[in-house]
Curated annotation (Swiss-Prot):
Location of region: Disordered: 1-20
Annotated protein name in UniProt: ATP synthase subunit b 2
InterPro entries linked to this entry: ATP_synth_b/b'su_bac/chlpt, ATP_synthase_B_chain
GO MF: proton-transporting ATP synthase activity, rotational mechanism; proton-transporting ATPase activity, rotational mechanism
Transmembrane segments: 34-54
Membrane topology: Single-pass membrane protein
Keywords associated with the record: ATP synthesis, Cell inner membrane, Cell membrane, CF(0), Hydrogen ion transport, Ion transport, Membrane, Transmembrane, Transmembrane helix, Transport
Keyword Calcium (UniProt): no
Subunit (UniProt): F-type ATPases have 2 components, F(1) - the catalytic core - and F(0) - the membrane proton channel. F(1) has five subunits: alpha(3), beta(3), gamma(1), delta(1), epsilon(1). F(0) has three main subunits: a(1), b(2) and c(10-14). The alpha and beta chains form an alternating ring which encloses part of the gamma chain. F(1) is attached to F(0) by a central stalk formed by the gamma and epsilon chains, while a peripheral stalk is formed by the delta and b chains.
N-terminal signal peptide: none
CDD domains assigned: ATP-synt_Fo_b (cd06503)
Compositionally skewed regions (Low complexity) per UniProt: 1-18
Amino acid sequence: MATTTHDAGHGAAEAAHGSSGMPQLDFSTYGNQIFWLLVTLVVIYLILSRIALPRIAAILNERQGTITNDLAAAEDLKAKAVEAENAYNKALADARAEAQRIAAETRAEIQAEVDEAIAKADAEISAKAAESEKAIAEIRAGALESVKVVAADTASALVAALGGKDDADAVKAAVAERTEG
């Protein structure tokens, strides 16, 4: 029975739609369908060409302008960075040259002070050496005179002890001859 009910309900639906089938495939309505297709396509074309496409083109142009400006700004910043690097390198080289110049000046000043101190020390040493040589010469001269006096006294005492006559001039001449030669 369910089969007959289903067939009866299905038959009623077919009768309501008619026996022609799908209306899109009905050749009698193709002219009307083509007309409305063309009208719809023209309306879509007009909407796209007048409203949507200009907006899209404006957005694309704006993006292209932004990209171009960003690229130009990047090139400008790159040039500034290269310029800053060159200025930094030049300043660094100048600072190194200045430091070397200051170090050379300081070395020269220190060397001059050292040379001056050495010259002063050499002069003091030479003066003290001259004084020492003078003192040594005086001591030698005094010692030589003392040796001559002691030698003359000893020779006189020996001559007297040996029983000879003490001749002071002869003893002094003999001592002078021995000490000088």
